[in-house]
């Protein structure tokens, strides 16, 4: 779904994508901030956050309580250092990736303050140090604590380790405010990093990946002596709680820090124009290779503190500052091969195998190739990229590394007189299971259709199968599914949906008893078996949703169930629409295909996904095994209800006090109405409870009838 443009997402798809992004970004935040071992590049991480923000902007009603746009970093690692609550939150900065982004930032500052862009507002520009953010607190001039940023609100108490850094003073000069929090970046110099790695190699120990991770890991040592041996350094550039402000500008505050004995960056300067900021950005970029510390951009800040106060903050970042990121580092190497990886959603992703090359101090052997169009030299909108040059095995390629882990191939260097290899043929068969891999119109990604049988997708498919709106099997959460899937004992393993329903029988004939395994017990095992048995008969729409057919979400599953009424009829139609000729997507001339297209709300994309699924023999085998254990119940035929809301589209918003949101949907459908998650011109009625916000405002704007919850009950005759 991540390859679908935001504008094409349905509300259900957008909600699912926001949930996926929230989990993914939280996972990578924890790896980066709490465990110091990132899995993806900075650019890939930024792309996740930008997509999250774009979806939230397009679907503001779907913004989650746990949205990444509402938090910073990750909570500190547990059972290591005591937590410290920051007196003032340590927020992250928004990013700029182009000159235009910087001009937009400066323009937004002028617009917010209601001033014309006449260069009257000064900005500072300083290198963005690639280290670990730190807050150091002094009371009455004495260092009392040092804390990491953590999640921005709570960090880790690393005071003992901070005291070992020679560049951080233990006392402030006389005259300093009673309470001072100096903030900055702990880092390891490149020269010290190389010396440390040489020492580790000489001792036969594993060397470190880069200075940033090494500095973070060194600062989190439980033994302060280890930290002291690592020669960590510090740059001061910001502050937290201050009982008195010794200066009224950003530049003035940093100068005060210098006078107090803190190292400050000598490349920090003040400018009154965007052109000045951008010129300094390029100058720092030119000087970057000669610096003895890693930087990944330049930070711009409004210089006057009174203007910073007026500008204030967004939920997780200040309006008065932005980080202008540098482009990724690049190197030239040879493409030795292309492997295909299958993701948990069935997406086939090409991975380049490279002649080893050092990029930014790290040896790179693999790189992402994104998708088959990217290999062909075609961009996301069909435009030529790399001047239309395709990528072939044996080519000289430019590798770009935009962070700590995942590099990418950005260009091909054609050598005159050198014969190239054959154009790469992207596989149309899944390498993990042998099922067909199809690419839907308008999408960049080719996906495996083996759904229920593909080992690369199995865990995710089973999690979906047992989820709340599918089979809803209590006791089979994410951890339990992972446990059963990875179990090697045949009496315990669950690799397909049918395995869930044979678990009890397999256990009866096994010496390995589930109740004897840690995390389970006799009571919980009985409850699990009871929950499984309770789903041996299941509503047709839940059964269809549980199969995990692409594009058949909860709404479309209900549409199909209502149209076909029985599983036998649905399966017959799907199989009759399967093309007799291999390679065709669907038998578009068949009556079954035309009937499926005629189902209200089901278009060709959904119908083709259904036919692709049933066209795979592997899927049919798994379904046969499942149907031997489970009976999908026939859907009751819809009859005219005579209800005043029959055929209408209803939106529920705000807090409902007499029913849950699911009960409200069920009641509306029982009376022949359709429910929607957003208000549009097609909405007939809005039921608004306390706290109704944007949906209520939109309904009022469009002149749509709005009633409260009590009036709803009266309207449908269930008061």
Curated annotation (Swiss-Prot):
Identify which cofactors the protein needs according to its UniProt entry.
Mg(2+); Mn(2+)
Q: Which residues bind Zn(2+)?
A: 430, 433, 448, 454
Its keywords, alphabetically, are: DNA damage, DNA repair, DNA replication, Ligase, Magnesium, Manganese, Metal-binding, NAD, Zinc
Looking up Pfam families in the UniProt record yields: BRCT, DNA_ligase_aden, DNA_ligase_OB, DNA_ligase_ZBD, HHH_2
Per the UniProt entry, the Enzyme Commission number(s) are 6.5.1.2
Catalyzed reaction equations: NAD(+) + (deoxyribonucleotide)n-3'-hydroxyl + 5'-phospho-(deoxyribonucleotide)m = (deoxyribonucleotide)n+m + AMP + beta-nicotinamide D-nucleotide
Top-level taxon = Bacteria
Is DNA damage found in the keyword set?
A: yes
Provide a GO CC annotation, any one: cytosol
Quote the catalytic residue positions.
Answer: 128 (n6-amp-lysine intermediate)
Domain BRCT residues, every copy: 640-719
A GO molecular function assigned to this protein is: DNA ligase (NAD+) activity
Positions binding NAD(+) in this chain are 42-46, 92-93, 126, 149, 185, 301, 325
**Gene3D superfamilies reported for this sequence:** 5' to 3' exonuclease, C-terminal subdomain (1.10.150.20), 6.20.10.30, BRCT domain (3.40.50.10190), DNA ligase/mRNA capping enzyme (3.30.470.30), Helix hairpin bin (1.10.287.610), Nucleic acid-binding proteins (2.40.50.140)
What InterPro entries does the record tag this protein with? BRCT_dom, BRCT_dom_sf, DisA/LigA_HHH, DNA_ligase, DNA_ligase_AS, DNA_ligase_CS, DNAligase_adenylation, DNAligase_N
The UniProt similarity line reads: Belongs to the NAD-dependent DNA ligase family. LigA subfamily.
Function recorded in the entry = DNA ligase that catalyzes the formation of phosphodiester linkages between 5'-phosphoryl and 3'-hydroxyl groups in double-stranded DNA using NAD as a coenzyme and as the energy source for the reaction. It is essential for DNA replication and repair of damaged DNA.
Stated name of the protein: DNA ligase
Whichever gene encodes this chain, its name is ligA
